[in-house]
Amino acid sequence: MANLGYWLLALFVTTCTDVGLCKKRPKPGGWNTGGSRYPGQGSPGGNRYPPQSGGTWGQPHGGGWGQPHGGGWGQPHGGGWGQPHGGGWSQGGGTHNQWNKPSKPKTNLKHVAGAAAAGAVVGGLGGYMLGSAMSRPMLHFGNDWEDRYYRENMYRYPNQVYYRPVDQYSNQNNFVHDCVNITIKQHTVTTTTKGENFTETDVKMMERVVEQMCVTQYQKESQAYYDGRRSSAVLFSSPPVILLISFLIFLIVG
């Protein structure tokens, strides 16, 4: 981690040094810059070439090369390249038409990676994610009949749960309660539309099964969440990263 921080700092300092040197270079005179590109030809802010009777080479009224009234190359009235009346590059209304197009939004790779690691986000469920498939737990319900019924029908019960990120809940009980409700609701609605109905015994057993899976999902997500926070804390507390952040603040303030 420390070696990575040192490499990042060295790369950033090198880049900023090159940018700083580029910014400090004097700008040469040219089109629309106020200075002259060639020494000894006019005062700063003047024409690139000495005027001849108010115009440029062969122009009576300040036009460009072969223009009577201030046009560009081959334009009679101040147009751009190939435009008769103030057009830009192949645009009748100026150059801003083609340069102000909105750029395509960039995909936030960090969010995509986080969603892939946590689970697939389910559309239409308000931010719920679908966990990975689990083995249904072997449960006992207090009597032989229910135990046998469960073993014979457990394949009809969910093996995945719906949940939201753990940081949206204050404790495990709230997470599990919400997880159980949305999972059973989605499973029963989806399965009922296929022609299968659930009895009260089925619902009772589903609640037990889904509760166990939601507890497992909470433990998994909670561990991943705290591991991520701890890794971030270690990264930002390393000396190279602290030095890099201080250097960035110095550049911004300075």
From Swiss-Prot:
Q: What one GO molecular function would you report for this record?
A: transmembrane transporter binding
Q: What is this protein called?
A: Major prion protein
Q: Where is this region: Interaction with GRB2, ERI3 and SYN1?
A: 23-231
Q: Where are the sequence repeats?
A: 51-59, 60-67, 68-75, 76-83, 84-91
**Gene3D superfamilies in the cross-refs:** Prion/Doppel protein, beta-ribbon domain (1.10.790.10)
Q: Cite the record's note on assembly.
A: Monomer and homodimer. Has a tendency to aggregate into amyloid fibrils containing a cross-beta spine, formed by a steric zipper of superposed beta-strands. Soluble oligomers may represent an intermediate stage on the path to fibril formation. Copper binding may promote oligomerization. Interacts with GRB2, APP, ERI3/PRNPIP and SYN1. Mislocalized cytosolically exposed PrP interacts with MGRN1; this interaction alters MGRN1 subcellular location and causes lysosomal enlargement. Interacts with APP. Interacts with KIAA1191. Interacts with ADGRG6.
Q: Which residues bind Cu(2+) 3?
A: 77-79
**Which cysteine-cysteine pairs are annotated as disulfide bonds in the entry?**
179-214
Q: One GO CC term of this entry?
A: mitochondrial outer membrane
Q: List compositional bias (Gly residues) regions by residue number.
A: 55-95
Renumbered to this chain, region (Disordered) spans: 24-107
Q: Which SMART domains does this chain map to? A: PRP
Disorder association: Found in high quantity in the brain of humans and animals infected with degenerative neurological diseases such as kuru, Creutzfeldt-Jakob disease (CJD), Gerstmann-Straussler syndrome (GSS), scrapie, bovine spongiform encephalopathy (BSE), transmissible mink encephalopathy (TME), etc.
The ranges of region (5 X 8 AA tandem repeats of P-H-G-G-G-W-G-Q) come to 51-91
Pfam families under this entry?
Prion (PF00377), Prion_bPrPp (PF11587), Prion_octapep (PF03991)
Binding, Cu(2+) 2? 69-71
Q: Where is the lipid attached (GPI-anchor amidated serine)?
A: 231
Q: What is known of its domains?
A: The normal, monomeric form has a mainly alpha-helical structure. The disease-associated, protease-resistant form forms amyloid fibrils containing a cross-beta spine, formed by a steric zipper of superposed beta-strands. Disease mutations may favor intermolecular contacts via short beta strands, and may thereby trigger oligomerization.
The role this protein plays is: Its primary physiological function is unclear. May play a role in neuronal development and synaptic plasticity. May be required for neuronal myelin sheath maintenance. May promote myelin homeostasis through acting as an agonist for ADGRG6 receptor. May play a role in iron uptake and iron homeostasis. Soluble oligomers are toxic to cultured neuroblastoma cells and induce apoptosis (in vitro). Association with GPC1 (via its heparan sulfate chains) targets PRNP to lipid rafts. Also provides Cu(2+) or Zn(2+) for the ascorbate-mediated GPC1 deaminase degradation of its heparan sulfate side chains.
